[in-house]
């Protein structure tokens, strides 16, 4: 593995150079293997979960359709970000073309927003299941899932589209070294010799509007869920509901917290090492993806039974 660091324009003008850890280049050494393992775990586990849901007829239910959508989003996010990061860590292959960079930027923003929206819909599903169990079959239907999926797709595709468009219209005046492992909007626009105020305002306003509204609805859903669970008389039912919903909420909280810390470190970039938000940005694209199949899948009895039935059929 090489650690060659050359911040001159060593590529053609049509390329950016991804320069991951400017202050701490040794981080590449100890991150390369764990990140590779996390990537394999995330892609493998989500693919397994996705295939289980679609091959096992008993799992053809609204909640599991949403879970399969979450797995698909995780797979796309991992494949969009982590392979390029690993080629930098292992082989120091830092160039990325302008079109590839802006495409990666769009997919990252769009699919992270879709994942946040999917968490919100799944939280609503749990709210209806626990707070209005008798009405659940009439509210959470296949038709509801189709409408929810269309909303997730339309809202986030349209809202995140201006981000790469605004970045692609900037002039970069010969500067092409991105101090990041990925084509994050803030890192790319920092290279421009144009005024990037509109870019940054849209990034923050759009991000807080999408993720903020999702988080508020998620928090409200789990607040009502907690209140309903605490009213249950059966101790076993209370423990089971708290265990399931608690793990779901902790994962969503982790997903949101690491994103919030990433934003705050960008705001306070003079007080923290510039490598910290770079590291958080990379981890944010793989750790939740590795945890989602465990929290939402393996710990769910119906999915475990579905996997066992598929294994028996295969044998």
Curated annotation (Swiss-Prot):
UniProt topological domain (Extracellular) ranges: 1-29, 80-103, 165-200, 263-277
Main location (coarse class): membrane
Domain of life per record: Eukaryota
Subcellular location: Cell membrane
Molecular function (Gene Ontology), one example: olfactory receptor activity
Annotated disulfide bonds: 101-193
Coiled coil (residue ranges): none
Cellular component, GO annotation: plasma membrane
Membrane topology annotation: Multi-pass membrane protein
Family: Belongs to the G-protein coupled receptor 1 family.
Functional description taken from the UniProt entry: Odorant receptor.
Protein name: Olfactory receptor 56A3
Gene encoding the protein: OR56A3
